[in-house]
A protein has these predicted regions:
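Phosphate- and other anionic-substrate recognition elements at nucleic-acid/protein interfaces
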Residues: 1-157
Length: 157
């Protein structure tokens, strides 16, 4: 049987003045997912590749299992930012909405605070520029990880 997903972990240097608390950013995707965890002096990124599934229930279960696999040992309350819809995109919006809902439900079950923010709002908060994309700033990171990092930073500032 083909594996359902592959997770690559990246630990990067912490920023100056790291925020106090646990902040999680998620760039949802139907095939590629980025997850970022900001915690004390750690910045941990996960680049996830998911096998495409036609079954929405399987996709939602996979999303929750992936989140639990990446974020399993934090006992603290967290704020989770899930990147919302980009209104210019037309493809796979239903599947992306299911991913967002499933990830939000995962976080709510852990009593985490959940925010779903549009990409422009995240960019304005983090970069003071709604057009500047995360992968244009952090060129050394996978695009999904860079987007997830900007999500986590958006709710930490």
């Amino acid at each position: 049987m083909k594996e359902k997903w592959k997770i690559e972990r990246f630990d990067i240097e912490p920023f100056d003045n790291m925020p106090k608390g646990l902040f999680i950013g998620v760039d949802p995707g139907t095939v590629h997912l980025g997850i970022c965890v900001l915690w004390e002096t750690q910045v941990t990124l996960y680049q996830v590749s998911i096998a495409r599934s036609a079954n929405p229930i399987n996709r939602m279960q996979d999303a929750q299992q992936i989140m639990s696999e990446c974020i399993h040992n934090y006992l603290h309350s967290a704020t989770v930012c899930i990147e919302g819809a980009s209104f210019a995109d037309k493809y796979r919006q239903v599947e992306l909405a299911e991913m967002r809902a499933s990830i939000a439900w995962w976080g709510l079950n852990k009593k985490f605070r959940i925010e779903i923010l549009p990409p422009n709002s995240i960019r304005k908060i983090v970069f003071n520029n709604g057009k500047l994309k995360a992968h244009e700033v952090w060129t050394n990171l996978p695009h999904d990880c860079a987007a997830a990092l900007s999500c986590a930073l958006a709710v930490s500032l």
